[in-house]
Amino acid sequence: MEEEDHATFAVGNPSHRFDRPLIRRSSDSISNLPDEILHHILSFIPETNLVIRTSVLSKRWRHVWSKTPHLSFEWLMVSPKLINKTLASYTASKITSFHLCTSYSYEAGHVHSSIEFAMSHNVDNLSLAFSSFPPCNKFPDFFYTSSSLKRVELRSASLTPSCIVSWTSLRDLSLTRCNLSDKSFLKILSGCPILESLSLKFCESLKYLDLSKSLRLTRLEIERRSCFREPMQSMQIVAPHIHYLRLRDSEAHCTFLV
């Protein structure tokens, strides 16, 4: 009789026996996914400090963020102290992408330690954006040596390598408002043997680009414009291997030798 009453109750009140477990299973369906898929989901969240907030969702989520291969920090929104604490809690051995936006002159020591952390974790894609203008930073020597970097994007940086550059896996280099001499740029190119794509935006200090030894470099994008309405010097470019060329808003004469 007890079983019949129980069965009757189950049929007469399905919400008590069926709906609630279904809701529970639905809420756990994402949490039950493998870490790799959860990391992919977290990669769509733009900033790491927001990713960390998912750790309060449940015990399952508590440490998921600490192995996400994508790290992104905006130091205008997050303090360097908090970033250091975040990196100290990071447990993955490999970083796919690392983005940092900050004022270099104010936090140079923190910037160097963050870059070193990313490179020690064999980062593939490195993006650094500095708010100081004109560029005033000086990267340490270890910055110019990496066998893992595949893409480097720098904004408002000063590139003056005093050591041999060795970016042996780099395929894509993007520089915006960066300060570097023709000699420094040639030194960087010599350390990128498989470079395929190069973007130079508002790097007005460059006057001569010799890309003849970059045999795999087939894509070139250049954008030049004077910010202070001062006349710019012409640029001479030697690029015999380029298949795709894009010039944008160029106010200065460019001479191509192919």
UniProtKB/Swiss-Prot annotation:
Protein name per Swiss-Prot or TrEMBL: F-box/LRR-repeat protein 25
PANTHER family: OJ000223_09.16 PROTEIN
Coiled coil residues, start to end: none
Superkingdom as given in the UniProt entry: Eukaryota
Gene3D superfamilies the record matches: 1.20.1280.50, Ribonuclease Inhibitor (3.80.10.10)
InterPro entries in the cross-refs: F-box-like_dom_sf (IPR036047), F-box_AtFBL13-like (IPR053781), F-box_dom (IPR001810), F-box_plant (IPR044997), LRR_dom_sf (IPR032675), LRR_FXL15/At3g58940/PEG3-like (IPR055411)
Keywords: Leucine-rich repeat, Repeat
Stretches forming LRR repeats: 101-130, 136-161, 177-202, 224-249
Signal peptide: none
Limits of the F-box domain: 27-76
